[in-house]
Amino acid sequence: MRSKVTGAQRWVVKIGSALLTADGKGLDRTAMGVWVEQMVALHEAGVELVLVSSGAVAAGMSRLGWTARPSAMHELQAAAAIGQMGLVQAWESSFAEHGRHTAQILLTHDDLSDRKRYLNARSTLRALVELKVIPVINENDTVVTDEIRFGDNDTLAALVANLVEADLLVILTDRDGMFDADPRSNPDAQLIYEARADDPTLDAVAGGTGGALGRGGMQTKLRAARLAARSGAHTIIVGGRLERVLDRLKAGERIGTLLSPERGMLAARKQWLAGHLQTRGTLVLDDGAVSALSQGNKSLLPVGVKLVQGSFRRGEMVVCVAPDGREIARGLANYSALEAQKIIGQSSDAIVGLLGYMAEPELVHRDNLILV
C-alpha cells in the first residue's frame, strides 16, 4: 500500500498554522527551514510539488500583538493581509537558499466555482510545476466572506490536488494521524494506518475541532481526503511534528494514516463539479429518480422531482436528495427555482406548455451531475 506514496510523482503538501508558528508568536523560521530542506530533497528526487500553506492569520496576529484569534471578519481579514506578506517572503527566502523559485497563488471559492477561472488556475499551476517552480497557495482571506470561503486549508488542498491531478495529498497536522478513538482521552486508542477514503466507519472516529490558530479538525481532513479521491489521489494524514516526516514518507515508512481512493479518476469536468462546495437549492426526488440516478450516467428529468427548495438560477449548483433526505447527487440546474417549481412531476414534453419555452428537456443533464 505504501508504494502509492513512494511512487507518487506529484505531491500536494498542506502545512497547518500550528506547524509554522512558534506557539502563536509569529512565524517559526527554523521550522520552515526544515520543511524546505525536506521539500527540496523531494524536488531533487523528481517529485513535483505544490505547497498549501496556512499561517497568514496567525502571523498577522503576532505582528499586531493579538493573543486570541478574533471572531470579527474584518479583523481576521486585516490579520491575513498583514501576515500573508511575511508568510510568502519567508517561504521565498528559505527556498531561494536552495536555488528554488516559488510563486504565490491566492484562491477563493469563486475562482474554482467558475469554469473559466478554474481552467485558468489549472493551466497556471501546471505551467509552474512544469517550470519546476514551487507554487505556494493559500486562501485569499482578505477578500472572502463566510459565504464563499473554503472553510479551511484542508479543503483547499484537496481542491488543488484535483486541479493539478496530484498522485498524493499530504496533510500535516498536530496529530499523528487518524485513531480509532480519541487518543487524548483514551490511552488504548490505535492509529489507523490504512483505510479507504469512503469507509463510513471513519466518520465516527473523526470528531473534534481545529486548534486555536486554525480552522480544520480531523473531520475536515477526512472530507478533504474524500474530495481528493475524486481525482484518484491518495491522502496521507500525518503528524507534522514527527522528525523528517516528509523524508520518511518518501522512504515508505509506515507512519500516518493513508486513505486510498474508492474508485478511479473522474473525468475533468466531473472533478470540477465535485469541487463545488456552495449549493443554492435542493431537489427532492421520488424513488424512481433515485434508482435511475444511482445506476449512473443518467440525467434528472422533471418528472422525477417531488419538491424544489431554496432559490437558485439556471446554471447554479443544487443538491439532489432522496425522500428520506439522503444526498444522492449534485448538479447544475438547467432551470431556475421558480421555473423548476412549475415543471416538476411533469414529462419533458409538457415543459413548453408550462413555461412557454424549453431550455433543455432535463432538469439536470448527466454531464453536469455527479453522484455523492
UniProtKB/Swiss-Prot annotation:
What EC number(s) is this enzyme filed under? Answer: 2.7.2.11
Reactions catalysed: L-glutamate + ATP = L-glutamyl 5-phosphate + ADP
Alphabetical list of Pfam families matching this protein: AA_kinase, PUA
Q: Residues in domain PUA?
A: 280-358
> What keywords tag this UniProt record?
Amino-acid biosynthesis, ATP-binding, Cytoplasm, Kinase, Nucleotide-binding, Proline biosynthesis, Transferase
Which PROSITE patterns does this one have?
A: GLUTAMATE_5_KINASE, PUA
Q: Which residues bind substrate?
A: 54, 141, 153
The subcellular location is: Cytoplasm
**Which residues participate in ATP binding?**
14, 173-174
UniProt GO cellular component terms: cytosol
Listed InterPro entries = AceGlu_kinase-like_sf, Asp/Glu/Uridylate_kinase, G5K_ProB, Glu/AcGlu_kinase, Glu_5kinase, Glu_5kinase/COase_Synthase, Glutamate_5-kinase_CS, PUA
Biological processes per GO annotation: L-proline biosynthetic process
A GO term, aspect molecular function: RNA binding
What is the top-level taxon of the source organism? Bacteria
Isomerase found in the keyword field: no
Q: Which NCBIfam families match?
A: proB (TIGR01027)
Biological function: Catalyzes the transfer of a phosphate group to glutamate to form L-glutamate 5-phosphate.
Q: Which HAMAP family match?
A: ProB
UniProt-recorded name of the protein? Glutamate 5-kinase
Lineage, uppermost ranks? Bacteria, Pseudomonadati, Pseudomonadota, Gammaproteobacteria, Pseudomonadales
